[in-house]
């Protein structure tokens, strides 16, 4: 989630309620680990942002509480779906695409064609050129793995990721 969004929400909430907000930006994995660590003595009031799967994990582990908002029926169907799937312990606030990004200048210098699809990344010419975040801490990187499993099937997805890693 963009820092600007968080700053605006924090300042607006403080202005409206008089309650001081201590906003901390962390990766999805860090927040989930923190909620697990705090389970016996919770310190976190609101978890805003992150990808859907960790929110569902937190809901299943009773790390979050249900909130039946009267605004839920006004949300997009996909956001309402996450609320239902989590027992109203999570609500989707944004939908972000997962895509490839590359530096055309670097590709031109190395005489590489731009990748056109995920499977292109496993080609030998891209060896050593691919970067990705750690899916243990990055919700987006984790979503990438889930996406590959959905696209290719589980075994083929992990074979693909091994090929990219080589």
Per-range role (PLM):
Residues 2-7, 26-30, 42-166:
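Extracytoplasmic ligand-binding site segments that recognize negatively charged/polar headgroups
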Residues 33-40:
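Short, well-structured alpha-helical segments in soluble
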Residues 8-22:
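Short alpha-helix C-terminal cap/hinge motif
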Residues 10, 36, 59:
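A short local structural element in Rossmann-fold oxidoreductases
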């Amino acid at each position: 989630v963009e820092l600007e969004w968080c700053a605006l929400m924090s300042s607006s909430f403080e202005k409206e309620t008089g309650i001081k907000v201590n906003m901390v930006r962390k990766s999805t994995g860090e927040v989930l680990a923190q909620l697990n660590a705090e389970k016996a003595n919770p310190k976190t009031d609101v978890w805003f942002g992150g990808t859907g799967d960790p929110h569902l994990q937190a809901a299943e582990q009773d790390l979050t509480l249900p909130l039946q908002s009267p605004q839920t029926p006004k949300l997009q169907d996909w956001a309402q779906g996450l609320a239902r799937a989590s027992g109203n312990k999570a609500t989707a606030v944004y939908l972000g695409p997962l895509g490839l990004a590359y530096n055309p200048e670097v590709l031109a210098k190395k005489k590489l064609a731009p990748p056109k699809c995920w499977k292109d990344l496993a080609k030998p010419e891209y060896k050593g050129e691919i970067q990705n975040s750690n899916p243990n801490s990055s919700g987006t990187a984790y979503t990438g793995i889930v996406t590959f499993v959905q696209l290719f099937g589980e075994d083929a997805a992990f074979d693909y990721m091994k090929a990219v890693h080589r």
